[in-house]
């Protein structure tokens, strides 16, 4: 049956049809919907893990146990999962295992533009990259076949445009694979040095076998047209190329982007007069072609940053672009702001009022850096606020103590904040950490987390008590405030900054957009009574 699906939903459908049994992920745009959609299939056990490392390890455990598995994350989440990734490449798997990773060229919702293909190369793990929803579904099923045939986890690399664009897919029924037998195999699965040394040559042979597979797999296909121009491309760039050129260029479309074929590329290059490489972000395909001794045009014309478009491809290839309607440049700029009623506003107002130096983190509350609050000084990655305040205070000593705080959301705290908090307790840092507990993972679309008491399906689940956790870590000063109570917030911040020991303030009020939050009638300014004191 044909259906219209976004790419992420198509991957989820592929998981279902291929008989995936376990999916563990951490939400992160643009990857989130894969697991949300997979959770709609009762045959797949789905969960939100505290972070991407845990998710990958859960999927690995399920694969070793004999059940096809999946873990999903955005590109920066792969940094968190890198530790087990490199070792699992050595151990291999039992049942098939897919690692879904979504890159964000253009940084629509990310702090950097890293290219996940580097991880596939470094970890020596095969990577598939679809260019539309139909391929997303089909490639997912093929990925399990590759995983089990070559004893390896397999990357399914998405990007924002493929993940969130709709196209037609052909669905089929689920094929339920038998649970594979688990056999204890210390030499294969226990990566102490002696065993790892024996596994490394196996990994290298696997790569050679996969290169041979890349030469003939239908994942990579040649579309011959005009031979004056030859283009090697992948993912959404393929769609742009076809829209610009049609049959006026010959195209080698790569779906298996690690490892890359050699003979296939060399044969294609011989059939065209001039060879171009069109790929978003880094020059992975281009570098491979140059290693093969080919004269190619790539990043000397196409940018290393931002996402591509049809117009960009046409412009860089010297093809006239039809003029389109231009926006009225006088339209007011509308930068992102916190939602009306956002509980984080009260705490950031307090911190700004007290002229605190604020180490920020990743979440909706990163918008606390935006005017008029302008409260956050530094934001790097998830969990960095707590570790950074420790380093900041150790570096500046009494000069910064009593003036610097860290802010982190409840989900981010569970993701990677606990180790930083343990470091503060262990190394006796006089630092104040504010956990902004809005009872949900807000920025990625209201996903549950270990502090909410509900699982991915909305059913009751275990709930972490933040106050008890902080006290168990050795913090004597732990207090809870309502960020709507500005006086209480101001009092708490002043008292904890003045204390001569580390402390935690939990700023707790549910996200204003949660369905179960009681919404009071909106307030209006009485212009006749307003004194113009700018209190609002």
Segments predicted by a language model, with ranges:
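Thiamine diphosphate
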Residues: 1-133, 161, 224-225, 248, 369-504, 517, ...
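Conserved thiamine diphosphate
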Residues: 104-153, 159, 194, 336, ...
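Short helix-loop-beta junction
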Residues: 37-43, 242-252, 468-474
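Flexible, low-complexity linker and terminal segments
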Residues: 1-8, 12, 18, 130-338, ...
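Short acidic, glycine/serine/threonine-rich loops at helix termini
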Residues: 34-37, 60, 81-85, 107-114, ...
């Amino acid at each position: 049956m044909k259906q219209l699906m976004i790419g992420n939903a198509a991957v989820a459908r592929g998981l279902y049809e291929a008989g995936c049994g376990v999916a563990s992920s951490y939400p992160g745009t643009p990857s989130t919907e894969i697991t949300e959609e997979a959770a709609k299939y009762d045959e797949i056990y789905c969960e939100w893990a505290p972070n991407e490392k845990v998710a990958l390890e859960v999927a690995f455990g399920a694969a070793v146990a004999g059940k096809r598995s999946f873990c999903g994350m955005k590109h920066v989440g792969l940094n968190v999962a890198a530790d087990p990734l490199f070792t699992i490449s050595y151990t291999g798997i039992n049942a098939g295992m897919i690692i879904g990773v979504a890159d964000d060229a253009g940084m629509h919702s990310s702090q950097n533009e890293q290219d996940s293909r580097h991880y596939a190369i470094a970890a020596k793990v095969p990577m598939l990259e679809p260019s539309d929803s139909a391929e997303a579904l089909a490639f997912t099923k093929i990925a399990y076949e590759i995983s089990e045939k070559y004893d390896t986890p397999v990357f399914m690399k998405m990007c924002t445009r493929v993940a969130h664009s709709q196209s037609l897919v052909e669905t089929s029924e689920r094929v339920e694979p038998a649970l594979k037998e688990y056999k204890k195999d210390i030499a294969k699965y226990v990566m102490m040095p002696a065993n790892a040394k024996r596994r490394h040559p196996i990994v290298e042979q696997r790569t050679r076998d996969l290169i041979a597979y890349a030469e003939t797999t239908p994942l990579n296909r040649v579309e011959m047209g005009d031979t004056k121009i030859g283009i090697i491309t992948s993912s959404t760039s393929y769609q742009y190329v076809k829209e610009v050129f049609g049959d006026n260029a010959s195209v080698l479309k790569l779906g298996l982007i690690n490892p890359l074929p050699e003979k296939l590329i060399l044969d294609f290059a011989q059939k065209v007069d001039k060879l171009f490489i069109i790929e978003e972000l880094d020059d992975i395909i281009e570098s491979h072609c140059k290693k093969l001794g080919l004269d190619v045009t790539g990043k000397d014309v196409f940018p290393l940053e931002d996402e591509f478009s049809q117009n960009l491809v046409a412009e860089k290839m010297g093809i006239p672009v039809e003029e389109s309607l231009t926006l009225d440049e006088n339209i007011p700029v509308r930068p992102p702001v916190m939602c009306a009623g956002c509980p984080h506003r009260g705490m950031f107002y307090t911190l700004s009022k007290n002229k605190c130096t604020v180490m920020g983190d990743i979440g909706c509350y990163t918008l606390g850096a935006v005017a008029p609050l302008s409260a956050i000084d530094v934001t790097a990655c998830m969990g960095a606020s707590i570790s950074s305040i420790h380093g900041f205070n150790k570096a500046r000593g009494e000069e910064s103590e009593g003036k610097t705080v860290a802010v982190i959301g409840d989900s981010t705290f569970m993701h990677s904040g606990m180790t930083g908090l343990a470091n503060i307790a262990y190394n006796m840092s006089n630092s104040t950490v504010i956990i902004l507990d809005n009872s949900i993972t807000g920025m990625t679309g209201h996903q549950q987390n270990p502090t909410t008491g509900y699982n991915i399906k909305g059913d009751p689940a275990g709930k972490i008590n933040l106050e008890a956790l902080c006290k168990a870590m050795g913090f004597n000063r732990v207090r809870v405030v309502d960020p709507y109570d500005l006086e209480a917030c101001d009092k708490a911040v002043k008292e904890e900054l003045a204390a001569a020991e580390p402390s935690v303030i939990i700023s707790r009020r549910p996200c204003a957009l949660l369905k179960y939050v009681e919404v009071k009638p909106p307030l209006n300014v009485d212009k006749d009574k307003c004194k113009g004191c700018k209190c609002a």
